[in-house]
Amino acid sequence: FKVENNFLYKELINKKQGLISIAFHNRSVDMLITWINCQTPTVSLYKKIKNKYLNSFVKNKRQRNKSLSVETSISGVRKIYKALKDNKVIAFAADQVPQRGMGEYIKFYNRDAYSTTLVQSLAKKTMAPVVYLYMKSNKNNFLSICIKACSNDIYDDSKHKLLINHDIEKMINERPIDYSWEYKRFKKSQAGILDPYKTV
């Protein structure tokens, strides 16, 4: 596969000023993280898998090349914050549904989705650069990795809340078939709102 804008990613890595690498569930997140970890060691967030053997396999795969994977918990968030302060590269999926109390309801495809605000918080606290990375196919199913810089609105309190979901929408819309719609993005509905997946 080809990599679009790899020069941008290498340039930001080489500055050694910390870097927030944002993925989402387009094609294979694990394949993408494997590629990222081949470019530079990272500290990444992951959601623990109930099957302990599969969990161990996935975690070990994500910890190659001196990378570290930490669970999506308060403790894990502290670790990636410290990694950023130490000018390391962090990576996680920004469309991952957070635990209750660790996110907010933000519009995603014009529907309230329980969303992480971790990207916005880390960016504002550290002023580290933020980039999106995602896998995409073309009409011949040839895969590419796309890398895009996040807007400076990520550092603006009046704009950053809606930014991540809006940007992810735009990238999904480039080729909607690539998004993992089976990943239940709206599974944590607000009180009184019907679960959209119950009839699926």
Question: Language-model segments: what does each one mean?
Answer:
Residues 10-16, 38-39, 43, 75-200:
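Non-catalytic C-terminal accessory region of glycerolipid acyltransferases
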Residues 17-74, 100-107, 111:
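Catalytic core of membrane glycerolipid acyltransferases/transacylases, capturing the structured
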Residues 1-19, 27:
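A short, well-structured juxtamembrane/interface segment
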